[in-house]
Amino acid sequence: MPCCSHRRCREDPGTSESQEMDPVAFDDVAVNFTQEEWALLDISQRKLYKEVMLETFRNLTSVGKSWKDQNIEYEYQNPRRNFRSLIEKKVNEIKDDSHCGETFTQVPDDRLNFQEKKASPEIKSCDSFVCGEVGLGNSSFNMNIRGDIGHKAYEYQEYGPKPCKCQQPKKAFRYHPSFRTPQRDHTGEKPYACKECGKTFISHSSIQRHVVMHSGDGPYKCKFCGKAFHCLSLYLIHERIHTGEKPYECKQCGKSFSYSATLRIHERTHTGEKPYECQQCGKAFHSPRCYRRHERIHTGEKAYQCKECGKAFTCPQYVRIHERTHSRKKPYECTQCGKALSSLTSFQTHIRMHSGERPYECKICGKGFCSANSFQRHEKTHSGEKPYKCKQCGKAFIHSSSLRYHERIHTGEKPYECKQCGKAFRSSSHLQLHGRTHTGEKPYECQECGKAFRSMKNLQSHERTQTHVRIHSGERPYKCKLCGKGFYCPKSLQRHEKTHTGEKLYECKQCGEAFSSSSSFRYHERTHTGEKPYKCKQCGKAFRAASVLRMHGRTHPEDKPYECKQ
């Protein structure tokens, strides 16, 4: 039998004597990747990595399964086979001989070397792991590559039974310590948080590798920001942040990305694929990050706290953005208008205001949006679902942020204070709008006359006055392509176009009546709810629509400061 049941040595199948090998640590020959890091590598980098590791497997005399019956070069070079399938074939051969449920000798949590060593007397068994994956073993050679690669490196070993059994069928493991990380792949648990930036990780080894970036101890140092990396490939990938290189292009829309993982997530916006589904409410998401962020809404968990004011957040990037309000750091500056922004997403959205680009298009009504947040908020208007209800007055809202804002009406809370004049506001958007009175910023520009405004509301009001002028002049520049009818404003044209298609995308869940526009749908909903949000300031009478309130206003004798010159 083999001289050791812990992969420290192997017995030559051609002799009856065991041959003791020189000590070899996996740390000395392996490159460590986390699952996140592996996702960032491009195809050529992964290929190089596989070739190096294949050569390493070939050279390590510790492997219990003989390779002489395989032509490794042929197996790898054959395009119909890949490295994963080759390893999984070996895994399945070994699994056939395993007997789940038996006990095993646990390997101590130290470096695995391949010299003869007495087995630890500690005997343990495991029946708690629920994952559906194969464990990689207990060593730094555990490259955390199970997600994208699936290389079950330690499964080449033949010694001993595999008693650690996954509760999902046909999955066996040699070492109990290797369970901890794969289990978190399924639960989404990331218990190791970086004290510097708040980023979380599945395993202790992953966070150790990450900390190198902050400590500056890695051999590959970024010349732009000083971050250090333990791996050349990760250093090269990081450089793209500074150089702006985006080698991964979407075939459908032409948009480019710095990372292949980001491209894959983006492609789901075209396909509509949302593989990450919430078990509590059934809502699905494009990316695991959005899914984990959503989960915290149910749990109420806010694990990331601002060191200055103690405010807590559901994810680390929100903390980083919030902390810039204390430091007033705004690293992203617009080259067109000079405005500086604190977050990259805000900066990208701002640039689209200049370019007019609206990459997020609603599949139901065709409306385009500058940001993903605006698009997601709009999507909910079609469903009519209002899951967020006020406990005090019973009013329901589509978005949790709208409910929070509404609740401040009851409490009188105004948490957003202007640092220049001390005035407080219920929402950050109102504070932002107020801030422009101090800075003089006017980001909303009329496409027809060039006049700029502080808010979108003011721009829309201005556009309505232009429409009013056209009513007198008779100008109708917006023509329907089907019937040639002209309109004063683009919104009127869009509403008209739906009369040709007969399309009625907004359906009332209570009575089944359908509407061609969201405004008509919202007005109709109020007939069921009895809601009358438009209130006359003079007599207190309330109305379902703003237009009805305006008509009512004419019944009161009052000043009319806006006079038509024509």
Swiss-Prot record:
Keyword rRNA-binding applies: no
Gene Ontology CC terms, in alphabetical order: nucleus
UniProt xrefs under SUPFAM superfamilies: beta-beta-alpha zinc fingers, KRAB domain (Kruppel-associated box)
Domain of life (superkingdom): Eukaryota
Pfam assignment, any one: zf-C2H2
Similarity comment text for this entry: Belongs to the krueppel C2H2-type zinc-finger protein family.
Task of the protein: May be involved in transcriptional regulation.
Name of this protein: Zinc finger protein 69
Species in which this protein is naturally found: Homo sapiens (Human)
